[in-house]
């Protein structure tokens, strides 16, 4: 019995090492946020949610991509006074922002209307589905 008790600390050390090794292999948990709301205050609040999640959980543990389409496309505009600084700050934390080209055409927007941090995808909804098929978890503000 004494031998078993003496080996318990070793067991906990080995278990901890195993869990740590597993955590390293899984990497950050991926999320994709659908941004389809046109209200700039709601867009700002959604980006503030991302900022809080990144602060609390950390960029090493979570990966976030925002796909903006329909009226949500305006959330990524360089001249959006409510969201432009948040887009820049969150990009520095590793958050990726994607703008839908179909929505850009519908709103008559050009790539030059967006900050350099924004990537462009052919269509927003298929991008959302594609990322979820790849294992991203869905997040809608």
Q: Whereabouts are the PLM-identified features?
A:
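Secreted/extracellular ectodomain signature
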Residues: 21-141
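Bacterial N-terminal signal peptides
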Residues: 7-17
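N-terminal secretory signal peptides that target proteins for export/translocation
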Residues: 1-4
């Amino acid at each position: 019995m004494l031998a078993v008790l003496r080996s318990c600390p070793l067991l906990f050390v080995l278990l901890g090492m195993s869990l740590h090794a597993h955590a390293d292999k899984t990497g950050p948990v991926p999320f994709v946020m659908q941004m389809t709301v046109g209200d700039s205050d709601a867009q700002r609040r959604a980006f503030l949610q991302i900022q809080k999640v990144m602060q609390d959980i950390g960029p090493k543990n979570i990966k976030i991509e925002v796909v903006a389409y329909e009226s949500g496309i305006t959330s990524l505009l360089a001249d959006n006074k409510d969201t432009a600084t948040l887009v820049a700050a969150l990009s520095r934390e590793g958050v990726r922002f994607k703008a839908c080209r179909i929505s850009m055409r519908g709103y008559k927007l050009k790539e030059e209307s967006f900050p350099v941090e924004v990537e462009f995808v052919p269509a927003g909804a298929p991008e959302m589905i594609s990322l979820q098929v790849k294992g991203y978890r869905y997040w809608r503000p």
